[in-house]
């Protein structure tokens, strides 16, 4: 039987909306403090969606086996008469008595040992399942609806759906992170919650570099039971994730809603290049779907990655996620409908080692200049090496992005770059008027 969706009745709420605040993380490898987060004004309460506002209940995974008491087999000694005259021989029985058990080295029977191992294995997965309880309450299904006409000129609704994540609650709206491709050019957006309550949502803002977007739901459309059962996502630190760490993929990692899969992180060093930035990817050994979506959860019940299969290597359907720490500021800006300053280049780091080998100056090597971007308008070209933004020296794309975040749309910044000519590299400056994303 098909379960009919529960359509929510409006419940009036009078809370004053507050600004969304997503606290950043410190990258232990950078030696730099995280960017300051945008905080609410004194008249509005700050909303913390990192999970620090409420203690995250986590279950420790214990895969150790309990000590078993060692049973000892009684060795019976029997003395029998020897056929030889006047002689006796003491013999030790090496065969177990009929009906007795044969014990292994550790004192357990083979059957008991196998049963114990299986129970420990089962308990391990049960513990891993339990740590996903709070993250699962933050998951929703986002549906993009368009009206189309069939061959017989009959109207019908075409629906596409994907996982969404509640990243903030300002007392008036729930802010849901999802992929823009599902809501682009649709006529209606709906969100389904944990109890099958279905409500309309509105588009807030999207980021073209990552393909992520925020949609929001008016909380007055949800009844008290639905609100009590949901949670704001506990966002962890992806900077603490290492190769080999266990993770649980939750949502629709294999293309089916409300599914989970277990695995380990196989790589934390892969990156994706985006306009004016780059993001780390968390690659796992979990086989997923090209249409998979959802989250990656660590054993503390914290979300460390957003599944984005569009970034999975071609021909390789393993579950891949964008590291959460690097997009927290982006999530905050999208939730607050704040534009980000834009120059329009893709770049890569020129490390000291690479500089020594190639003679390219240290800095950010431009691999692409976006068409009609502020960078192109200012005269910047591919293979220029950016060394300063304003008065601040930049040697990595991360430093470049951090400095870029200090500017607003319309600001004019002087970009210093090195350009190769007939006599080697020469310094050039470009006055760039910041665009808007």
Per-region residue spans from a language model:
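N-terminal targeting leaders that route proteins to membranes or the secretory/organellar pathways
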Residues: 1-151, 158, 175, 223, ...
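C-terminal, low-ordered peptide segments at domain boundaries
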Residues: 117, 216-237, 243, 424-437
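Active-site loop architecture of trypsin-fold serine endopeptidases
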Residues: 149, 157-158, 186-188, 222-230, ...
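PDZ/PDZ-like groove recognition
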Residues: 156, 161, 333-403, 411-437
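A conserved glycine-rich beta-strand in the N-terminal activation segment of trypsin-fold
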Residues: 120-130, 146-175, 198-200, 232-234, ...
């Amino acid at each position: 039987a098909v379960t009919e969706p529960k359509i929510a009745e409006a419940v009036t709420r009078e809370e004053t909306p507050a600004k969304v605040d997503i606290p950043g993380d410190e990258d232990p490898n950078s030696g730099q403090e995280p960017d300051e987060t945008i905080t609410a004004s004194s008249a509005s309460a700050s909303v913390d969606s990192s999970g620090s506002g409420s203690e995250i209940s986590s279950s420790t995974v214990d895969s150790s086996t309990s000590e078993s008491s060692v049973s000892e087999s009684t060795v019976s000694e029997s003395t029998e008469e020897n056929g030889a005259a006047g002689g006796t021989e003491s013999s030790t029985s090496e065969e177990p008595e009929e009906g007795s058990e044969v014990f292994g080295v550790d004192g357990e029977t083979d059957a008991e040992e196998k049963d114990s191992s299986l129970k420990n294995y089962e308990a391990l997965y049960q513990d891993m399942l339990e740590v996903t309880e709070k993250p699962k309450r933050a998951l929703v299904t986002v549906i993009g609806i368009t009206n189309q006409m069939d061959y017989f000129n009959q109207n019908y609704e075409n629906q596409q759906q994907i996982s969404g994540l509640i990243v903030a609650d300002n007392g008036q709206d729930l802010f849901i992170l999802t992929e823009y491709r599902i809501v682009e050019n649709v006529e209606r957006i709906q969100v389904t919650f944990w109890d099958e309550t279905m409500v309309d949502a509105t588009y807030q803002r999207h980021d073209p570099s990552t393909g992520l977007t925020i949609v929001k739901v008016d909380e007055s459309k949800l009844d008290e039971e639905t609100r009590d059962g949901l949670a704001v996502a506990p966002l962890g630190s992806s900077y603490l994730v290492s190769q080999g760490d266990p993770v649980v993929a939750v949502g629709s990692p294999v293309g089916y809603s409300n599914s989970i899969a277990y695995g380990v992180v196989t790589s934390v060093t892969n990156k994706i290049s985006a306009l004016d930035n780059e993001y780390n990817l968390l690659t796992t050994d979990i086989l997923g779907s090209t249409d998979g979506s959802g989250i990656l959860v660590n054993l503390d019940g914290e979300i460390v990655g957003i599944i984005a299969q569009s970034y999975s290597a071609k021909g390789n359907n393993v579950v891949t996620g964008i590291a959460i720490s690097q997009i927290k500021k982006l999530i905050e800006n999208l939730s607050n409908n704040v534009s980000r300053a834009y120059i329009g280049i893709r770049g890569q780091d020129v490390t000291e080692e690479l500089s020594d080998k190639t003679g390219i100056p240290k800095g950010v090597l431009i691999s692409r200049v976006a068409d009609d971007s502020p960078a192109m308008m200012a005269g910047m070209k591919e293979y220029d090496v950016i060394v300063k933004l304003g008065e601040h020296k930049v040697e990595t794309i991360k430093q470049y992005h951090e400095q870029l975040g200090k500017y607003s749309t319309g600001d004019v910044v002087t970009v210093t770059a090195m350009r190769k000519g007939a006599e080697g590299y020469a310094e050039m400056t470009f006055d760039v008027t910041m665009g808007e994303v």
